[in-house]
Design a protein with these regions (language model features):
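N-terminal presequence-like segments and the immediate start of the first folded domain
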Residues: 1-59, 63-76, 82-130
Length: 130
């Protein structure tokens, strides 16, 4: 097994718990779940509505990936956590807009009873470095 690299990034939202923004080993990159915080102002209230929250979450994930030299095209798997499964279709519409139809990562969506900072959605990624 190769070295394990823990990425703590200044430009990404500050962790709300004890974790790294991403952990990398043997070309695999595990990106910690992001909630819809503003990376430039964590005191700002979360966006209202599942559409705005989903956009912010994926933009935060893109930021983490870009800081370590990767992009959405490197994502092989995602997990989405939703407070309200009635928002599944709306979240999917926003999520799908970030990936070409024939290049979408594998994904699981899980209904949960709560997320940090009362977020409505959290998403994490697994990416592969070329």
């Amino acid at each position: 097994m190769g070295a394990i690299i823990h990425h703590m990034l200044d430009r990404a939202p500050a962790p709300v718990a004890p974790f790294s923004h991403a952990v990398e080993t043997d070309g695999w990159v595990f990106v910690t779940g992001q909630i819809p915080e503003n990376p430039d102002n964590e005191d700002e209230p979360l966006p209202v509505g599942i559409e705005a929250q989903t956009r912010r979450v994926i933009d935060n994930l893109k930021l983490v990936l870009s800081e370590i030299g990767l992009g959405l095209e490197h994502v092989v798997s995602a997990r989405a956590f939703l407070i309200d499964m009635r928002e599944f279709e709306t979240m999917n519409k926003i999520y799908a807009s970030y990936f070409p139809p024939n290049k979408r990562p594998a994904r699981t969506c899980i209904g949960v009873t709560g997320l940090a900072k009362a977020a409505r959605v959290e998403i994490d990624f697994i990416a592969r470095r070329p």
